[in-house]
Amino acid sequence: MIEELSASELHIIEDLAKIIWPVSFRTMISQKQIKYMLEWMYNQNKLRENYQNGHKYAVYKEKDTFLGFISYEIKKKKSNIRIHKLYVHHEQQKKGIGQTLLKYAIDIGRQNKMAQLDLFVNRTNPAVHFYKKTGFSIVEEVDLDIGNGYFMNDYRMKFKI
């Protein structure tokens, strides 16, 4: 089941990220970079700021257990939904949870008459294949300097709704 979160529930996103990231990114980036990015992107102040700027957060939940999450933003002027975050607990991958969260964003895009979804994903992330299988295409390579000598080496991918 997918539930949208309120501002007071954003700690759930931080808690999930701290569980998911160290395992999911261990072969892509260093543990130091993982720690840096978690502190930068998933602290409560940053999550609240993003929420106030229009980012929506939703979790995938079974019984009382949170198994994954998505963050997205509707960009009406560009007729686009930007998926900022989509993560599933490593023990729950390949069970359709990621597809369910992605379908959730696609459905929101259709309801809001958006033309496409886009997202950024690390170029070495196995999720690239998941997105391609789902109908996303690679638009460009992006190398973003995020400070402290770290870079995000991503693909920007898009999906036409």
PLM regions and their residue ranges:
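Active-site acidic-Proline motif in GNAT/NAT acetyltransferases
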Residues: 89-95, 123
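Residues forming the Rossmann-fold NAD(P)(H) cofactor-binding site
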Residues: 99
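Acetyl-CoA-dependent GNAT
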Residues: 4-91, 102-104, 108, 112, ...
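Conserved hydrophobic/aromatic "anchor" residues
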Residues: 69, 92, 114, 130-131, ...
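Conserved catalytic-core motifs of GNAT/GCN5-like acyltransferases
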Residues: 118-122, 132, 137-155
